A protein has these predicted regions:
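Positively charged, polar, low-complexity stretches
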Residues: 2-9, 17-121
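Structured mid-domain segments that build the active-site/substrate or prosthetic-cofactor binding neighborhood
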Residues: 12
Length: 121
């Protein structure tokens, strides 16, 4: 995807939903994005992508983690050069919003379906 090509590969902010190709995701504005980044600061990665890459098991683990926590981190131990494409694939399959990629860690958010279960937005 073209929007993943950035000069600063250390940090990446996902586009807003006006440019997004995933129509069922919620729109996150810059203030909400900053709030999610602050909330994710103390969170440890719950999913680690290793030598096997993004498998169905990884997708299922990300989906279950998003249901339980809404906001998660994914760490890339392998495939560091392809982290943007892999994160894009995970976001598409799990219907999640990419908050930011910092280094080899991606922060993903998916709002809970029930309003009483929502923790962040």
């Amino acid at each position: 995807m073209d929007y993943f090509k950035t000069k600063n590969k250390k940090s990446h902010i996902a586009p807003n939903s006006k440019n997004s190709y995933i129509k069922s995701m919620i729109e996150i504005n810059s203030k909400q994005r900053k709030l999610l980044e602050k909330a994710a600061h103390d969170i440890q990665p719950v999913v680690i992508v290793g030598g096997a890459g993004v498998t169905d098991g990884v997708i299922q683990m990300v989906d279950n983690s998003l249901i339980a926590h809404e906001l998660i981190k994914i760490k890339y131990n392998e495939y560091k050069d392809e982290k943007f494409e892999l994160t894009d694939e995970i976001c598409q399959k799990c219907d999640a919003n990419l908050v930011r990629i910092i280094g080899n860690v991606a922060i993903l958010f998916r709002q809970a379906e029930k309003e009483e279960d929502r923790k962040y937005l």
